[in-house]
Amino acid sequence: MKIAIEAQRIFRKEKHGMDYVALETIREIQKIDRQNEYFILVSPGEDRCLQESDNMHIVQIDYPSYPLWEQIGLPSTLKKIQPDLLHCTGNTAPLWCHTPLILTLHDIIFLEPKQGKNQSVYQKLGRCYRRFVVPRILNKCRKIITVSNFEREHICKFLHWEPKKITTVYNGYSSHFRPITEYQAVTQKYIGTEHYFFFLGNTDPKKNTARILQAYRHYLNTSSQPLPLLIADLKEEVINNYLRTYGLTDIKSMLYYPGYIPNKDLPALYSGATAFIYTSLRESFGIPILEAMACGTPVKIGRASCRERV
């Protein structure tokens, strides 16, 4: 059987949740399946994190944007490969494609009312693209996979779908997430103190960054020995904008914001943290919760969404 797997962004240097889910899924398939033939469809990128094997081939498709890659480049490549099955791993798929389709629909947050207005232009365009594509491809799917029963129930209720049409395949965490005892060499690259709180930030309103910063100022004002806050994935100009907008410039000296942190450094940063904070307003799963727990780190979560079940 010839199986094509869409994994467009796994070679990009700054990968995030869905990219890692696709990458780790492919790596595990590579270990256990020697019978079927796989074609991994990717964009060119700096991080060549996957190697070919006898029955697994990497096919690079070079288009300047995600929609063009998915709606023109991907169908064109499928015509050449002629696979028996296509698995699209990141919520969307080609609108015009005759290959039997399996879709991983991580969430339908993009179909729900927005929770704020501070999204980037890139996020807004991505939301519009998903809102257009997803309703038009769902009925074409042979099977839909989602990542938690919480999200499965939500999809069925929101889209009026029968539960039998959707299969839950839970996310997990990579084996390199484990307690690290000698973490100082890594943590010193990002924060110059031994004790700290760790937060994964984002400009998406659902990540709740503004309220975290407001709550952190309250903590600073009420604690006799406050700990600094390490914020991943937010650049200085974004932090400065939050602080100005919400009148929080007085807390800047207690914040560390190195920007994107490579996945290989996260186990040490989780292990060194006094606690990991994950209080986003809406998630379908929440992989960082498992990663932090696997490293032995206490986790502070909000009650919204799927996190209590996780």
Language-model segments: residues:
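Carbohydrate transferase catalytic cores enriched for Leloir-type hexosyltransferases
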Residues: 1-308
